[in-house]
A protein has these predicted regions:
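N-terminal binding-site loop/beta-alpha segment at the start of enzyme catalytic domains
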Residues: 1-81, 85-89
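Short glycine/proline- and acidic residue-enriched helix-loop micro-motifs
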Residues: 102-115, 245
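Conserved, mostly hydrophobic/aromatic
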Residues: 6, 18, 36, 51, ...
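Generic structural signal for well-ordered alpha-helices
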Residues: 40, 63, 67, 124-128, ...
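Beta/alpha (TIM)-barrel catalytic core signal, keyed to glycine-rich beta->alpha loops juxtaposed to Asp/Glu
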Residues: 3, 144-245
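Short, flexible, mixed-charge acidic loops at enzyme active sites
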Residues: 90-103, 232-243
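Short, acidic/polar
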Residues: 30-43, 113-131, 175-181
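Short, well-ordered coil/turn segments that N-cap beta-strands
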Residues: 11-16, 47-49, 73-77, 133-137, ...
Length: 245
């Protein structure tokens, strides 16, 4: 497995990453926990070192499954997670509402974008507990909170880095203008964006910015959520709650 530097962070990560959204079950029609753990182990055996999760993936389930699967293997992998999406309608700006894990439940959970300093710290502490680790290799803002000053968000992450709780700082789903505002307050190591043969919009904005600022570009959904694998047929039936349905 080839590796590449994670921007200027000094971290080397595999060019193929394990995206952990699906193992959380939410919006993927549920999950088989034993199979999810086997998939993580298979990824490690194949040479994958970069594992990327987020608190909103299964509302903590993805984190918890990774924590179980990585027991005794933590020193072999680069663990990336995210912050900035919280289940608190009183803070930040609304991002979406969902039926969460039980898709037959009529009660909606509202998820807001909020990247205030204290909120980020709470999210990180909760992620560390679920993942059963004492540090995160990469912390990324999941979606940008336009109500919180970018400098406040960056300072919170810099403080966590100084404390040894994170090693590198990144963003996801950010414009070049937003990245520039973050970088006015501190160093960004990476940006994660949707990128595949079918979705190439970042080639005009985010990708050139990252190249010009020596940042790593992490691509999510590079196989268009399975569409480009060649394994999906027109008669494929997806479970209730699966975003591909």
């Amino acid at each position: 497995m080839h590796t590449r530097p994670l921007g200027p962070s000094g971290i080397e990560a595999s060019v193929v990453a394990f995206g952990a959204w699906a193992i959380g079950g939410w919006r993927w029609g549920g999950t088989d926990e034993a199979q999810a753990i086997r998939a993580v182990h298979a990824g490690i055996d194949a040479g994958i070192t970069l594992f990327d999760t987020a608190p909103v993936y299964g509302f903590g389930l993805s984190d918890s499954l990774l924590g179980q699967a990585l027991a005794g293997k933590r020193d072999k992998i680069i663990l990336a997670t995210k912050c900035g999406l919280i289940c608190d309608p009183t803070k930040g700006v609304k991002h979406f509402s969902t039926n969460a894990l039980n898709f037959d439940d009529d009660g909606l959970i509202q998820v807001n974008r909020h990247s205030g300093g204290e909120s980020i710290r709470r999210e990180v502490e909760a992620s560390l507990r679920r993942l059963k680790t004492d540090h995160l290799d990469l912390l990324q803002t999941h979606w940008q909170d336009t109500l919180t000053p970018f400098g406040e968000t960056m300072q919170a992450m810099l403080d966590l880095k100084k404390e040894g709780k994170i090693r590198a700082i990144g963003v996801c789903n950010a414009t070049s203008q937003q990245m520039a505002q973050y970088q006015a307050a501190g160093q960004l190591d990476s940006d994660q964006e949707k990128y595949s043969m079918l979705f190439r919009g970042i080639e005009k904005d985010q990708l050139p910015y990252c190249q010009n600022h020596s940042m790593a570009m992490l691509a999510y959904s590079p196989l268009a959520q399975g569409l480009l694998t060649g394994k999906l047929t027109t008669d494929r039936q997806f479970a209730l709650g699966d975003l591909r349905r």
